[in-house]
Amino acid sequence: MIALRLTRASELKPQAVSWLWPGRLALGSRSLLSGDPGLGKTFLALDWCARLSSGRPMPDGSPNPGPANAIVLSGEDDPKQTIRPRLEALGADLDRVFIPNPSDDFVDGPCLPSQWKQLDEAVAARDARLLVIDPITEFLDAGISLNSDVAARRALRPLKRLATRHQCAVLVLRHLNKSGRGPSIYRGGGSIGLLGACRSDWVVGRDPTQPDISVLAQVKNNLGPRQPSLAYRFEGGDGAPPNLVWLGTSSLQADQLVGPAGGGVKEKAGERARRVLKEIHALHLDFERVLGPANGDDRQVLDDWE
């Protein structure tokens, strides 16, 4: 058995947070970017990769540690048809942005948590400062459900080790759940444990008063003060990648974009109860994996909930 080694708190040297995007994306940390399809989550992530690769300021004018390398794992967009053209349009240094080799076994990317070491080696070999996983559901081992708190944390735990070891910012993309109701902290797909495992969460949503404008807003940020929301829109296109235009700050907050204020519908008591029971059910299944199957009475209660 390996002994647990302990260190006195007095022996630890205080360390300030290092930022890829000051106040928003921390180096050595995991962050979430959440939103419905069609609002440009992938485009935003590629924009940040492009800015890092070329050393250009971030959308709010703040600096980044570039020029530096980035790795993009995309499970939904074709690298040749979509990823490269977008990066090029965004002004990326294409020699500094890496994707899995199409001729490799990991044509889309490694699965988590079983193949995290291959990913760790890739980050080390390329000295990457940003790792984008888009979306997280495409890169999970078979049988891993993000609706399970324990499973979600287990899948993301190796990414914490990777981020800390290489001082790399890990950006995990996910879709919103289908409820369409409730505060933003509960709108991200999967268990609340996914949010708990990451140090920051950012959400994109449409401006309710200007449908052609979308907004990036903070859901949570454990490592820095609250940051202002940023508005953006896409212009052009017509067969070519559209232009991403950042429009400055917005007064809209996350709950106004995806919660009751934005949707105009308040979560009903019955819906809230069903959501809570589903979370309890997922937690019960986690305990079953550790402590063994439930007895008959417990199983009947769970069946009644369903």
Feature map (PLM): residue ranges:
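C-terminal regions of RecA-like/P-loop NTPase motor modules
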Residues: 4, 124-127, 165-166, 207-306
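Conserved inter-motif catalytic segment of the P-loop NTP-binding fold
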Residues: 15-16, 20-22, 26, 37-39, ...
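Phosphate-binding/switch region of NTP-binding enzymes
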Residues: 32-33, 38, 42-43, 130, ...
